[in-house]
Structure formats: structure tokens, C-alpha cells
Amino acid sequence: MPDVYFQDTKSIAVFAPDGPKPQFLIQTPQFKALVVGLEAGQQIPVHPGEAAMYHFLEGEGLMTVGEETFAIQPGATVVVSSGVKRGMNAKTRVVFLGSKGES
């Protein structure tokens, strides 16, 4: 089993010019938790997926969930039901913690 305590979760994020490079804190068939870094201007295209939670640690941007778009900033949390489309655009460098369960 991987570490269970991460003192500085933001420092785990990896930033790359070609897009997000998720860093898994845990990855099992039942559950995934990851840290993602996006550079300003990068995006995650709108796509359907399983139920998920996104908690923003750094930066500002926009997140689309279904037909709604929300401003994201440190401390914001977005919860998305299974099958609902979601995506995001980073206005500044963004770091978020994501988790999702089994489909």
C-alpha cells in the first residue's frame, strides 16, 4: 500500500507543456485518488466519466459540469455524478486533488 499521509499534496503535482500528468496517491480497482497540475491555458476537454470529486488546492479557472460552468479557486470542491460530462480550463497554474470510485 502507498503512503497514507501526504504533508504537502500540492508538491506532488507534475506540470508538463503537453498537458496534465496525473500523479496517483492510490489506485485500486475500487478507488483512485490523484493530484493533477495544469499550466495556465491548459484544459481537460469535456468528457463523461464515473462519479468523481475535485478539490482545488491552487490556481483559478473554469470547470464545466453538465450544462453549468463554475469558477474554481483554492478551496472549491466540485462533485460530479456518474455519466455527467465534465471538463476544465486553467486561467492560472492549477493544482487539484481528484478521487473517483468504481464505475
Predicted regions and their residues:
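A short, N-terminal "cap"/entry segment at the start of jelly-roll beta-barrel domains
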Residues: 1-34
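Short, conserved beta-strand element in jelly-roll/cupin
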Residues: 37, 48-63
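A cytosolic small-molecule/anion-sensing beta-strand core signal
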Residues: 57-58, 73-74, 92
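Short acidic-glycine-tyrosine-enriched beta hairpin
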Residues: 67-83
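Ligand-binding loop in jelly-roll beta-barrel domains
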Residues: 82-103
